[in-house]
Amino acid sequence: MARRTTTRVKRREKKNIEHGIAHIKSTFNNTIISITDRHGNAISWSSAGTIGFKGSRKSTPFAAQQAAENAAKAAMEHGLKEVECYVKGPGAGREAAIRSLQAAGLEVSVIKDVTPIPHNGCRPPKRRRV
């Protein structure tokens, strides 16, 4: 008879982090929220796509709100209480994600726009003709 091998399941360790950074990347197609510690190590992340929104629904403020709530709940399990929000991109879910982080119980201390703006760098793509 063959021996049964048992695999040990390693549990995620609980990090006791009170202050963190919420990186909100809001594009025209999706919204991604990553919550990290002060050094940039990821605690939790979520996006409109991972929650189950598909296609054009991913770019809505409601999808960003749901993604932010999901990321905040996962981060609060590690003891997170206060976040700085770094917002990047021109998408519709910017403000909705910040409001949702506050509603989930995280204290937002700083809101900073870190959208990259070129100093006339690469040539932009051609205009769409619909």
From Swiss-Prot:
GO terms for molecular function: rRNA binding; structural constituent of ribosome. The keyword rRNA-binding applies. Keywords: Ribonucleoprotein, Ribosomal protein, RNA-binding, rRNA-binding. One of its GO terms (cellular component) is ribonucleoprotein complex. One of its GO terms (biological process) is translation. HAMAP family: Ribosomal_uS11. InterPro entries: Ribosomal_uS11, Ribosomal_uS11_bac-type, Ribosomal_uS11_CS, Ribosomal_uS11_sf. SUPFAM superfamilies: Translational machinery components (SSF53137). Located on the platform of the 30S subunit, it bridges several disparate RNA helices of the 16S rRNA. Forms part of the Shine-Dalgarno cleft in the 70S ribosome. Belongs to the universal ribosomal protein uS11 family. The lineage of its organism: Bacteria, Bacillati, Bacillota, Clostridia, Eubacteriales. This is Small ribosomal subunit protein uS11. The keyword RNA-binding applies. Part of the 30S ribosomal subunit. Interacts with proteins S7 and S18. Binds to IF-3. It comes from the Bacteria.
